[in-house]
Amino acid sequence: MGYLLEETLSSNSKTPIVIDDDNELGLMAVRLANAAAFPMVLKAALELGVFDTLYAEASRSDSFLSPSEIASKLPTTPRNPEAPVLLDRMLRLLASYSVVKCGKVSEGKGERVYRAEPICRFFLKDNIQDIGSLASQVIVNFDSVFLNTWAQLKDVVLEGGDAFGRAHGGMKLFDYMGTDERFSKLFNQTGFTIAVVKKALEVYQGFKGVNVLVDVGGGVGNTLGVVASKYPNIKGINFDLTCALAQAPSYPGVEHVAGDMFVDVPTGDAMILKRILHDWTDEDCVKILKNCWKSLPESGKVVVIELVTPDEAENGDINANIAFDMDMLMFTQCSGGKERSRAEFEALAAASGFTHCKFVCQAYHCWIIEFCK
C-alpha cells in the first residue's frame, strides 16, 4: 500500500510522490532501461580527458572546476561553444554514480562545479605503469568492434554459432586483431591487470626461489616487468605471438620470445597464465596447460591469474556482478571463452596432469591460483 510523501523539488514548490513497492520497482526498471547512457558517457569523458583534468587539479589544490574551466584545460580544446553546457550534463550523470563530486553552483561562475572522486585514479590514462588503468578497457569494450558483436547475441542464442565471427566475417578475436592495427593497439593497452599483479605481490610469495619465469601469452610483457622489478634475480621470458610482441617495450631481465602456446612453450621453473584461460574453451585450455606441464620441472607450477565465478548469483554482490559481466564479455567476444568456478579450475588442472590446484589469494577481482605439477 502506498503513501504520499511531500518532497521539495525546487525552492518554490512541493510535489506529492507516491512511495510503495511498485513505485520502487518501476524506478529500478526505468534505470535498467536507460542503463546504456552511463557507460557511453564514461567512455566519452575518458576520451576527452575529463578525469585526468579533474584529477590533476585535485592533486594540486583539491579545488572544484566549472565545466567552462574543464573545457579550457582538456587536451583538445573544444571548438563547440556549447561544450561547457554539454560537459555539465555529462558530469552531473557521473556525479550521480559517485564518480565525480558535484559542488554547489558558484555565484561568481554561474555554473555547477566538479571535483574528482578517489575512484577516478583507476581511470587515468597516464596511470597504467603506476596502478594500472581501466580507461582503455572502457574504450575497448565500447569500441564499434565489440559493439557490433553484442548485436549478434540474440541470434547466437537462437541459432548457435559465434557472436564475434558473425559480426566480423567469420574471424575469431585474435585473428581479427592481426588485421586491425588500430584495434590491436588499443586492446593491448588495457592495463588494469598490472594493478592486479602489483596488489597480489603485496602478499603472494610464490615467485621466491624462481630462476626462470615464463609468461605464457604475456602480451607486451608488462606483467614480467612488474615481477622482475621485485625479484631482480628472475630471468623473465615473455612468450606470445609475433603480432603481440611487435608493440612490446624492453624491460630489465625480460626476454621477448615469439611462438604459439598451442604448439609448445619455453621451459622455465614456473609459468604465468594471466587472464589467458578465460579466452578459450576447456579443450583449448587443456592443450595450453599440457604444453606448460611438459616444459616445467618436477616441482614446477603454473601461476594462474583469473576471475573465479561464485556458485550462486547473489543479489547485490559486487564480485558476482563483475564475474557475470566478464563472463558475458567472454561469451560474446571470445569464441568459447568463459569465466570459471573453483570446481572448473580444479577440473582443468586434473585434466592437464597437475597434481593439485591451490587458490592462494585474491587481488581486486582476480584470484592467484597455483597449478602444481
Swiss-Prot record:
Tree of life domain: Eukaryota
Induction (record text): By the green peach aphid Myzus persicae.
Pfam families according to UniProt: Dimerisation (PF08100), Methyltransf_2 (PF00891)
InterPro entries: COMT-like, O_MeTrfase_dom, Plant_O-MeTrfase_dimerisation, SAM-dependent_MTases_sf, WH-like_DNA-bd_sf, WH_DNA-bd_sf
Classification via SUPFAM superfamilies: S-adenosyl-L-methionine-dependent methyltransferases, Winged helix' DNA-binding domain
Residues where S-adenosyl-L-homocysteine binds: G217, D240, D260, M261, K274
Annotated GO MF terms: O-methyltransferase activity; protein dimerization activity
Pathway: Secondary metabolite biosynthesis
Active site residues according to the UniProt entry: H278
Keywords: Methyltransferase, S-adenosyl-L-methionine, Transferase
Assigned EC number: 2.1.1.-
GO biological process: methylation
S-adenosyl-L-methionine found in the keyword field: yes
Enzyme class: transferase
Assembly notes: Interacts with B'GAMMA.
Family classification: Belongs to the class I-like SAM-binding methyltransferase superfamily. Cation-independent O-methyltransferase family.
Function according to Swiss-Prot or TrEMBL: Involved in indole glucosinolate biosynthesis. Catalyzes methoxylation reactions of the glucosinolate indole ring. Converts the hydroxy intermediates 4-hydroxy-indol-3-yl-methylglucosinolate (4OH-I3M) and 1-hydroxy-indol-3-yl-methylglucosinolate (1OH-I3M) to 4-methoxy-indol-3-yl-methylglucosinolate (4MO-I3M) and 1-methoxy-indol-3-yl-methylglucosinolate(1MO-I3M), respectively.
Protein name: Indole glucosinolate O-methyltransferase 4
Species in which this protein is naturally found: Arabidopsis thaliana (Mouse-ear cress)
Highest classification ranks of the organism: Eukaryota, Viridiplantae, Streptophyta, Embryophyta, Tracheophyta
